[in-house]
């Protein structure tokens, strides 16, 4: 009998009617009018059209075709990026960019003045993988998972192998989003913050954030990971470079900030700063902790930091 082990090993769905759908705005036969999206030679034009055909908890998957829309892309064809702002309300859906390498399938926000969000998640158990959020109407947010205030929760989300560049103000924002996992992502100079929970929102708890790169996110702004007021998160094995801290300049709370929360475990992260006791730009300046957190063996330029940042 093929059961759970087969499903976990080979990624096969136990739901016989799982829909596999394809989106590719660069394909000559792509259209949202008449195609079902289930034939890769007759894909949808937009992600929104594919989402409209998804069903709760059936394991539906949307594959988004690669494009050559990067600034230095060498081709003259297939250069149309995904340029949409979509809201996911289907539980258990996966959206996967199919770039075989590089930064991911390029996805641009479209709302001007930094007000757009590429993907809003109002559903549980969503997987997002393989996208590069950049370009388009600069600013805005790459992914925002949140409770809708009623019955739809952006919980249990997985984001992996995505890229967020300096065109984005916020990489990923969580609001009352628990049990999410963010891994293998690259946050390159996001203007305001890499991963964020606004103190005016409900806390983001029980999340797992690991093996990500943050390079000068929120320089002079919020920072790499701002989880003020959030609790019981595990944050480990992240690489955080801050140019001001590296040079001995002030970088207050621009690393990891869990102040006001509690019971977070933060360990084995790498910071471009000196250990505590130096002053501007040191471990205590770059980071903030709750008194009930456990910060364990984090790496700084002068060795190991073995206490909670003050």
Q: Model-flagged regions — what are they?
A:
Residues 1-49, 68-69, 300:
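Right-handed parallel beta-helix/beta-solenoid
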Residues 52-56, 187, 200:
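Residue-level signal for alpha-helix termini/capping positions
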Residues 77, 84-88, 103-105, 117-122, ...:
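Glycine-rich beta-solenoid repeat tracts in large extracellular/virion proteins
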Residues 26-32, 67-70, 99-102, 218, ...:
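Acidic glycine-/aspartate-rich tracts in secreted/extracellular proteins
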Residues 92, 96-97, 124-135, 153-166, ...:
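Right-handed parallel beta-helix
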Residues 21-27, 45-78, 93-100:
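Glycine-rich repeat segments that build the extracellular carbohydrate-interaction surface of secreted
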Residues 29, 71-79, 89-142, 161:
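Right-handed parallel beta-helix/beta-spiral solenoid domain characteristic of secreted/periplasmic
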Residues 3-4, 44, 53, 97, ...:
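Beta-strand-rich, repetitive solenoid scaffolds
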